[in-house]
């Protein structure tokens, strides 16, 4: 599915929106997906960055909208309103502060992405990495060749190198970046895609309507803050 279908770029890695959960702080709370975050016990303990200036936070926003009914679905936006009411105005200053605050025990759960979450898990930190049961969006990381590149044949060889079995296996086993090759090897903490409920992002829609999506989010967040 994540293949070069346009001729303009080639996907070679996959970025994944996940929830990172502090095990010690959530012993009595079941967290398997987005719906489980709407728990009053988590008020002020949900870490997220600002979707307006964080690509991972924006990916989380569009992921939850897809899962809750769609980008223009009012029920989906009601979910966003309810979730950010529990965030309680505590927006992390950066994407890295999201997973760090959960690892440090400051926050109970964070809206983050797979790479740093798996690094913490591999390092033995007492966290869980949750792939939302409602649906997890996989966004491709792409490589492209510049038009009229001086060394076009070498550029093509480099793309082939990125997609080779050896490099894809190394990505999956020696890093925490998910390879795009279907049969690539992965480390033990990288959950198989066959075990994940995969949701599909309408990338064309999101690109064309990013400003409108962010305006809707910012209006909701501002309204929440005005009432606190």
Regions found by a protein language model. Name each.
Residues 1-106:
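Extracytoplasmic ligand-binding site segments that recognize negatively charged/polar headgroups
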Residues 136-137, 141-201:
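Mature extracytoplasmic/periplasmic domains
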Residues 35-38, 65, 81, 99, ...:
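Non-transmembrane alpha-helical segments in soluble domains
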Residues 97-98, 115-119, 134-137:
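Short, catalytically relevant binding-site loops at active-site mouths
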Residues 79-85, 91-92, 123-147:
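Periplasmic-binding protein-like
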Residues 103, 108-126, 175:
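A ligand-binding cleft/hinge motif common to bilobed small-molecule-binding domains
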Residues 188-228:
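Extracellular/periplasmic bilobal clamshell ligand-binding domains
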Residues 1-7, 119-131:
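Ligand-binding "clamshell"
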């Amino acid at each position: 599915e994540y293949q070069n279908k346009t001729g303009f770029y080639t996907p070679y890695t996959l970025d994944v929106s996940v929830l990172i959960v502090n095990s010690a702080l959530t012993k009595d709370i079941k967290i398997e997906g987005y719906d489980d975050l709407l728990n009053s016990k988590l008020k002020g303990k949900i870490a997220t960055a600002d979707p307006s200036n964080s690509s991972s936070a924006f990916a989380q926003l569009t992921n939850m909208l897809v899962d809750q009914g769609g980008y223009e679905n009012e029920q989906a936006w009601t979910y966003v309103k309810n979730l950010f009411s529990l965030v309680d105005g505590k927006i992390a200053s950066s994407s890295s502060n999201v997973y760090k605050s959960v690892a440090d025990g400051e926050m109970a759960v964070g809206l983050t992405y797979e790479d740093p979450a798996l690094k913490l898990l591999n390092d033995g930190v007492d966290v869980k990495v949750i792939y939302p049961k409602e649906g997890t969006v996989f966004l491709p990381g792409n490589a492209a060749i510049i038009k009229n590149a001086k060394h076009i044949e070498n550029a093509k060889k480099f793309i082939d190198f990125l997609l080779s079995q050896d490099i894809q296996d190394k990505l999956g086993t020696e890093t925490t970046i998910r390879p795009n090759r279907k049969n690539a090897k992965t480390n033990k903490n990288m959950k198989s895609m066959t075990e994940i409920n995969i949701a599909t992002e309408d990338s064309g829609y999101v690109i064309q309507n990013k400003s409108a999506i962010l305006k809707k989010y910012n209006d909701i967040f501002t309204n929440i803050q005005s009432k606190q």
